[in-house]
Amino acid sequence: MNIEQIENSFEPTPNKKCSIAKKGMVSSAFPDATKAGVEMLKKGGNAIDAACATALALGVCEPQASGLGGQSMGIIHVNGKSYAIDGSSRSPSLAHSSIYTNKKNRRLGYKATTVPSTLAVIGFLHERYGKLEWQKIVAPSINIAKKGYKITQLQHDLQERELENFLSIKSKSGAKYFLKDGLVPYDVGDRFIQEDLAETLASISEFGYRVFYQGEI
């Protein structure tokens, strides 16, 4: 990996703005998620609190790349020591290689998924190293899911690209959730509200992250 080449490829934003902070900084792929992390720092939280809140919020407003159904890893530096948290996900315990002889099963539907580790990693990090109450960590993501966020150009383009795949799933569950009226892509700037996800996150907030794996969820 050529670090110098990567750094030289970075370009400043068109407005030439930069961010400066004395006590902490949060960076993510979506403004609402970044705000969630900053909110934790303002409440007196540490870097772990900010990272956990940011990750949960990304799962709401960046569903194409983040979410409760994904896998996550973490690298942290605490008290002079560095730690890596391996959240690589695995196939369900009852899965068998014969399931995946069909190419479609390897790409689409529930059989193509692995056991999600994202929430377990976030919960572990918060339990072990976090400072703020768990409910405060989850609160921003609940609010974003309830109030919604504006669909980006990338999300619109991905919905168009994957439209056939969405509609090919027998249950149409993905189409009902991610497409407008379950049929067509959202337009850029449309507000995307996720009431079901807000309820799920509210349960996670109230009962802890383990409810996702061992509880009613």
Question: Which stretches of residues belong to each language-model region?
Answer:
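Noncatalytic scaffold domains of N-terminal-nucleophile
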Residues: 1-35, 39, 47-214
